[in-house]
């Protein structure tokens, strides 16, 4: 179990796993860059993530390639891939939630409410609208 006490020199950017993080802000305000920096801070620690899943709105997106993701998705994947064995990070980057199907919305809600707390998953989500984000 991770804690703020060990190691004593823990950086504020090395958030205790598992966690949920929501980054809200307009276009070009540094949301994705902040999420990448938090991920990289974990990777430089003694307990890095073993898996990284990126969920984004474009299959052509290359901005996360330098983080060597395990998989890149354009839809919320089946939640069975999160088996709880490996320390996992999911980054949902500027994913459009208003046009999601009911099944996709259900998967996202289950991921945020259950998977992040019971399956060894930390989830970071960036979104551009303060008013339309997932509850």
Summary of predicted features, one role per range:
Residues 1-15, 36:
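Pre-Walker A adenine-sensing motif
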Residues 7, 21-41, 57-61, 73-135:
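Conserved P-loop NTPase motor cores
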Residues 13-14, 43-46, 80-82:
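Short secondary-structure boundary/capping segments within folded domains
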Residues 15-21:
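Pre-Walker A (Motif I) flank of P-loop NTPase domains
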Residues 47-49, 67, 85, 118:
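Short, well-ordered coil/turn elements that cap or connect secondary structure elements
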Residues 51, 58-70:
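Conserved substrate/cofactor phosphate-moiety recognition/catalytic segment
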Residues 40-52:
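Post-Walker A helix-loop "phosphate-sensing" segment adjacent to the P-loop in P-loop NTPases
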């Amino acid at each position: 179990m991770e804690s703020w006490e060990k190691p004593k020199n823990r950086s504020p950017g090395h958030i205790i796993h598992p966690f949920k993080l929501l980054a809200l802000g307009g276009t070009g305000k540094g949301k994705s860059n902040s999420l990448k920096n938090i991920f990289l801070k974990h990777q430089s620690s003694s307990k890095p993530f073993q898996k990284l899943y990126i969920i984004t709105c474009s299959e052509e997106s290359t901005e996360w390639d330098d983080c060597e993701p395990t998989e890149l998705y354009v839809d919320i994947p089946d939640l069975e891939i999160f088996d709880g064995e490996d320390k996992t990070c999911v980054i949902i980057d500027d994913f459009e939630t208003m046009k999601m199907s009911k099944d996709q919305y259900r998967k996202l809600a289950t991921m945020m409410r259950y998977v992040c707390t019971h399956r060894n998953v930390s989830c970071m989500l960036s979104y551009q609208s303060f008013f339309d984000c997932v509850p």
